Amino acid sequence: MTKTPKLTDVIEKNRQTINEILADPSTHTRLIDMHWIRDELSAETKILFQYPDYMPQKEKKMYLDFSNIKNLGLAWDHIVKHMNVKTIDNYSIRQIHTILCKDTDIPGGQYRLSEAHIMQLGINAPNYQEMLYRMDDVEYHMKDKRVPVLNRAFNIHYDIIAAQPFNDYNKRTARLIMNWFLISNGYRPILFNKRTDHDDYMKALRARANGDTKTYSHYMYSCMIRTQREIIKRLRKSKVL
């Protein structure tokens, strides 16, 4: 009976394949990879956005401000420009949030000053007076090299969401910081750009909130492998014949 490869082994094999393709001088890397990812982020935002339950279907298309999508692209440009940074700290997190909030009514980069309940996860966020300490914990765990990179990346994503440091755009900030961390450690980012992710993403977060780290991690691994395979497919098409 053939043994099914571990998801982490598949990820490492895909990572090696991507690096080998990118090292090939005959590949038009400028036309793919980071540029394609930037385009897909707008699709991801539309898919993952959790509309208010009361909102009629016909109004949903107008609800998502296109400045939000533009800002997401600008935040991605910032990450690509600083993809080789040695340390991502709390200032970096606030900086990304500031970019996401440009031309909106959300105070960019400012920690919330009121209590928060994460209704979608069924948990209370920490007291706003604890925010500096909670975000220091996020930064500490991000730097803890005793923990494997992928585990740290997934923890960063969830911990920022669970802390709810800002008045809004916490999940977007968490995804971008996770991907920045992955890129700075030699991986490609994770995209949640399939229609099934609208429900599956929140199911995974709820599982993690209930202590089920296995289900959460399996979903994150699966999305990473899916993204890697899409990148490999597109990179191979970019070769000069």
Q: What kind of region is each of these model predictions?
A:
Residues 1-241:
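FIC/Doc superfamily catalytic core
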